[in-house]
Curated annotation (Swiss-Prot):
Keywords: Glycoprotein, Membrane, Transmembrane, Transmembrane helix, Transport. Its main location: membrane. The gene is vrtL. Coiled coil: none annotated. The keyword Nuclease does not apply. One of its GO terms (biological process) is viridicatumtoxin biosynthetic process. This is Efflux pump vrtL. Belongs to the major facilitator superfamily. Glycans are attached at N7. It is found in: Membrane. One of its GO terms (cellular component) is membrane. InterPro entries: MFS, MFS_dom, MFS_trans_sf.
Length: 503
């Protein structure tokens, strides 16, 4: 067993950097050092820093294939979240919805379920792995989403939408951890950009298709078509998706070696914990981090705010184009392309610049990287988002239809830059506890995505599109313009004071 000890003793820089191993509420308790392994010949870790089974050492092509596959799972659920927007009026007539809040609830209740999923799916992926959870949750989502198409009462629709949303929340809860499993800090920006694109583009692509489905078919086909797409993603995942959670891979290695050697004393560095114990801490740690960590608190608030505005925009788009600009549902749905194009432009520049800026600033700092080197993306994105909101709000109904689209495009450009900057900043700041920090963000983000569309019609009825959207823009200025500079200066001190932060 001495060879086993030598080969599996190294915590390795890869694993050390995989402080991102935590994808749920309970992390590996401590990273084993070389001395730990020397004292414990039964400890199973990676075979040094270059272990090919460590996901961070996989060939780049394999890592990108896994990243894109995870992103497909992340993409399909947000498509379903907003695809019914162009069909809400037909759906309301069919199921007897009369109050505005009921109509918008049919869209946003799906997002409410997103606040529950991360609490369960994060810790469950610690025990059962990323792949199994992604596939099982997708089947759950598919079944209930299919049921929405057969709903005969508004109560059934609300219940089925909520249950479908719970399954659809799993990729959003697990995806960020899966990305950090495979990529180092210097590489992570591009991968996180691809991952971020799913939640941002999904709600945009959905209404484009939903508009034509609503115009030429019935609202029921909105649900049936997304279920067919989810089935296609399931098939792709079956063939392409590979387990990348280091803790799960090391447990499999331990089981294989125990079978080969007959040594049942072999073990990994993880604590053996039940799902119930993990669930308890899954709820506890995100709450603690949200209430005690200024970085998590501020990033969660701003991320949730931008997410809420995005869903407010998705929900109110159909009325703007069909009522104000007198377009058909199908043509009106095409206006969502402005958000998609803006997202692509924002992602393109971030992919080109975010990791380059990080490496440049790291080189100037004697090769030492800091999470604060993600702040330029947030600063620039916040300014762009604010400009987009003002442009969008004051051009509705007062100018040619292209002008609100340009405003929405500018807002989307800035938003994806902000989201990517905030997500990578949190992952870099709380590597070991990144998933708990992201879970706190996800819960608040989902609550805003649920709530903002519900007050949107009342806000616009009272203030109009110009002043209503300007109110949102002024809040973006206050929060988004100041936060990047505050964390650039005070972030290192806040992290030094934190028991959760790294670096």
């Amino acid at each position: 067993m001495s060879k086993l000890s030598d080969n599996h003793s190294s915590a390795s820089e890869g694993e050390k950097e995989a402080g991102d191993l935590e994808s749920g509420p309970t992390a590996i308790s401590s990273e084993p050092s070389f001395d730990d392994a020397d004292r414990d010949p039964n400890l199973i870790t990676w075979d040094g820093p270059k272990d090919p089974e460590n996901p961070k050492n996989w060939p780049k092509g394999l890592r990108w294939k896994n990243t894109w596959t995870v992103s497909l799972f992340v993409f399909i659920s947000p498509v379903s979240s907003s695809m019914i927007a162009p069909a809400m009026s037909d759906l309301a007539k069919s199921l007897g919805m009369h109050a505005e809040i009921e109509i918008y609830l049919s869209l946003s209740i799906f997002i409410l379920a997103y606040s529950i999923g991360p609490i369960f799916f994060g810790p469950a992926s610690e025990l059962y792995g990323r792949v199994r959870l992604l596939q099982i949750s997708n089947v759950w989502y598919l079944a209930w989403n299919l049921g929405c198409g057969f709903a005969t009462t508004k109560g059934q629709l609300f219940a089925f939408r909520f249950l479908a949303g719970i399954g659809g929340s799993a990729p959003l809860a697990i995806g960020g951890g899966a990305i950090s499993d495979m990529w180092t800090a210097e590489e992570r920006g591009k991968a996180m950009g691809v991952y971020t694109l799913g939640p941002l583009l999904g709600p945009v692509v959905g209404p484009i298709a939903g508009g034509f489905i609503a115009e030429y078919s019935t609202w029921r086909w909105v649900f049936w078509s997304t279920s067919a797409a989810a089935l296609a993603v399931q098939v792709v995942g079956f063939f392409w998706l590979q387990e990348c959670h280091p803790g799960t891979l090391l447990r499999k290695r331990r089981d294989r070696l125990a079978k080969e050697t007959g040594n049942e004393n072999l073990h990994t560095a993880e604590k053996v914990e039940t799902l119930g114990y993990k669930l308890l801490h899954a709820f506890e740690r995100p709450v603690k981090m949200f209430t005690t960590q200024p970085i998590v608190f501020c990033m969660a608030i701003y991320m949730a705010y931008l997410f809420g505005i995005s869903y407010l925009m998705f929900a109110t788009f159909p009325e703007i184009w069909t009522v104000v600009y007198h377009e058909s549902p199908g043509i009106g749905g095409l206006n969502y392309l402005s958000i998609a194009i803006g997202s692509f432009i924002g992602l393109f520049f971030n992919l080109k610049l975010v990791d380059r800026i990080y490496r440049s600033l790291k080189a100037r700092n004697n090769g030492v990287g800091k999470p604060e080197y993600r702040m330029p993306s947030l600063a620039v994105g916040s300014v762009i988002s604010t400009i987009g909101l003002f442009w969008y709000g004051w051009s509705i109904g007062n100018t040619h239809w292209i002008m609100p689209n340009i405003g929405a495009l500018i807002f989307a450009m800035g938003t994806i830059s902000c989201l990517q900057g905030m997500q990578t900043y949190i992952v870099d700041s709380y590597q070991t506890y990144a998933a708990s920090a992201m879970a706190a963000c996800a819960v608040l983000r989902s609550l805003c995505g649920f709530g903002f569309p519900l007050f949107a019609p009342y806000m616009y009825n009272s203030l109009g599109y110009g002043w209503g959207t300007s109110l949102l823009a002024f809040i973006t200025m206050v929060v988004g313009w100041g936060a990047p500079f505050a964390f650039w200066h005070f972030g290192p001190r806040l992290r030094a004071m934190s028991k959760y932060a790294s670096g």
